[in-house]
Curated annotation (Swiss-Prot):
Pathway: Nitrogen metabolism; urea cycle; L-citrulline from L-ornithine and carbamoyl phosphate: step 1/1. It comes from Rattus norvegicus (Rat). InterPro entries: Asp/Orn_carbamoyltranf_P-bd (IPR006132), Asp/Orn_carbamoylTrfase (IPR006130), Asp/Orn_carbamoylTrfase_sf (IPR036901), Asp_carbamoyltransf_Asp/Orn-bd (IPR006131), Orn/put_carbamltrans (IPR002292). This is Ornithine transcarbamylase, mitochondrial. The modification N6-acetyllysine is found at residues 70, 88, 144, 221, 231, 238, 292, 307. It is an enzyme of class 2 (transferase).
Amino acid sequence: MLSNLRILLNKAALRKAHTSMVRNFRYGKPVQSQVQLKGRDLLTLKNFTGEEIQYMLWLSADLKFRIKQKGEYLPLLQGKSLGMIFEKRSTRTRLSTETGFALLGGHPSFLTTQDIHLGVNESLTDTARVLSSMTDAVLARVYKQSDLDILAKEATIPIVNGLSDLYHPIQILADYLTLQEHYGSLKGLTLSWIGDGNNILHSIMMSAAKFGMHLQAATPKGYEPDPNIVKLAEQYAKENGTRLSMTNDPLEAARGGNVLITDTWISMGQEDEKKKRLQAFQGYQVTMKTAKVAASDWTFLHCLPRKPEEVDDEVFYSPRSLVFPEAENRKWTIMAVMVSLLTDYSPVLQKPKF
């Protein structure tokens, strides 16, 4: 009987301890910030100021420090649910979002094209309204940016771009966090893009100048970035006193660059163009020859998955490659995005230098 009583008392103590932990997870004095992102959509970094993007990176560093380094339990998203709509397959976006949202106490629900067809079986308007009634936010990985725009217009909850034909903002946040950790600051860095004029490059163009970073981009003829995005990027560069150059010469783009960046040459949905693209991108592989004209402190980034024709093993697996630290940072940055859009949490960690 005494043994049963001890068991009951121990269970009660554990329940009390768990309740206390949940209620008191936000210890430490938060650092005050004027940035308020709660309730916003994240469709493109074009819609965010430099200060707002810095805040998301600051929050990423804060969560990484408190959870990974200090081992704290932070159920900031307890009771929250996330709808994840994926028209395109994914490893890092799906895994980082699912594990990150769950780590913060939330419940992610994954939907593929087998479960939901945007605008096919049901209008985007109706889908947005249904999701708004059942979840607290939606992360959508889609073929068309216009679908995200409609979802955001019709939904009453935050919509996050997990990738579209035009932008991939959450990837760029992970890139910037990784570079800040490595260099100690982003201001003054020169980013050298060598590859396709795609959604990754577009997202860099919508944000780099806001941090005081210069951009040198090389793309093959016929594969340049969207002209409207180039025009806006030129405006950002002028406003922030940074350089923006576009060329068809990979070595010209790499010259003096601190960060060599490339991506897949053949994105999902472009498989029929494989032969044509491989021919067009001849000479665009990032190698040590490319690195020789870069800055002495050069590093390398690739958002993955990677093919050998895009970057050789010598660069990809070198100590200069930040590819795998960046892949991990996908988790901390998407966690920060969700926390900033869904809660009033303020970072405890002192703001890093940007």
